[in-house]
Amino acid sequence: MTQCIRNGAGVFLLSIMVSGADQKTVEVETKDAEADRKWVSLAPSKAGMGSWKALNFGGEGDTTWKEGTLTIEEGAELSGVVFTGKDLPEAPYELELEARRTSGVDFFCGLTLPVRDPKTCVTFICGGWGGGVVGFSSLDGMDASENETGSYQAFKDEQWYKIRLEIRSESLKAWVGKKELVDVNTKGRKLGLRFGDIEKCAPLGLSTWQTTAELRGLRWRKLPE
């Protein structure tokens, strides 16, 4: 009888030890996952353009980074920058920034970014086609003004708007402020960039069209699979 009690106590103690080890394993895995999901800032850490390069479109406006804020001056048509660094987002991930139009009448945030892989990119447009269209270009060869991601929103000059994107291999989501504007399944869809100068912004770039804008707080982090 005593031996049975001892054996039972041993099993109970072993169960506690195993349970504790499992808990520690879970804690380590959780910490590793949290470390993988840390925000990565894409703004230069010191004065200058950092890992960003001004693009030559012909007639483009000046671009400058200052204290974490990118200013893109109005050009004849397209103006912008491309990222040349190593911290390129890889799906699944989320990316966020704030943007505002200070002058002009067209898009103040043209964010080109990788989706399924670095060679497959789309552009998130905020304030395009006369100042109000929001959406992704291109899906199945159709621009944001033509596909189901497009919607019209009213934007005020000099007002900051928070933009958050969630990029997965088979879906795209977008929020402006607290409002979700895009939630589209892209499985089996053809994703790509509009033909023309916007291709220079790949795989990660920021641009405007005949508009002066300021953009800040640009960062990304991994999402769980």
Where are these regions (language model features)?
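Extracellular carbohydrate-recognition regions
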Residues: T25-N56
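Short carbohydrate-recognition loop motifs
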Residues: G61-G80
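Secretory/extracellular carbohydrate-interaction modules
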Residues: E77-S137
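Beta-strand-rich interaction surfaces with strong enrichment in secreted/lumenal proteins
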Residues: V81-D87, T149-F155, L204-G205
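Extracellular beta-strand elements of beta-rich domains used
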Residues: L97, L218-W220
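Short, aromatic/His-centered strand-loop micro-motif at the edge of beta-sheets
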Residues: D140-K162
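Carbohydrate-binding surfaces in secreted/extracellular proteins
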Residues: K162-K190
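Flexible glycan-contacting loops in extracellular carbohydrate-active proteins
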Residues: V184-E214
